[in-house]
Amino acid sequence: MKLRLSIILAGMIAVFGCSHASMPVVGVSCSRSGSGSALLPTTYTDALRSAGAVPLVIPTVSDEAQAAAVMEVVDGIVFSGGEDVNPAWYGESVWNETVEIDSVRDRSDSLLARAALACGKPVLAICRGSQLMNVILGGSLYQDLPSQFSGSVAHSGKTHKIGLEEGSVLAGLYGTDSLTVNSMHHQAVKDPAPGIRITARSADGIVEAWETPQIVAVQFHPEKMLAAGDSAWLPLFKAFVSRTAQR
């Protein structure tokens, strides 16, 4: 697997190395099938293409050198949704049977996240991606909202409103103090990592978005809403792609 990934990365550098001047290349993390195949809904790549980027699905990496090689190819990275982040990463044991973990992906995403942070690549973190980045930066998660949090909002399979913080990326893009978003998660940020700015919450207080100068993180799935015909979410991806093009 290590040799195969090295060959893939070498090919990627050869193919994309001279294309950055025209279109930014944006990496996207992905899940794995039971047999180890890379899995990613096309909604992510479609959204990035619509925003003017060349999307590049990133297979799992196994060491810092591979993660660094990926960063040589991409101008930014999207951390996508998927499995739950292993609670051991934030000092807890598994809460209950609802927690589904892929330790191989956790390690890969952690390596990619740390490499992206180290070299200043713009990051868009979606759902699991938001949770992952919060953990990487020193925060923790609710492992299972239905059993750990008493809230008034249904966070799985529903839509609901979120309140936006003035001066945030989302508030600036949409010129409003609230948005309606989809919701399909059972985990969420519990203790925010030091240094991050919480920029959106649901009515019951769950973190729905946060940011740093390098990261925009959302708990909801803008790519799914865009794919369903809600073009209002394209500006979020365009703003991210614009940031990657400035590097």
Predicted features along the sequence, with ranges:
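Beta-strand-turn-beta hairpins that frame and shape the catalytic cleft
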Residues: 195, 212-215
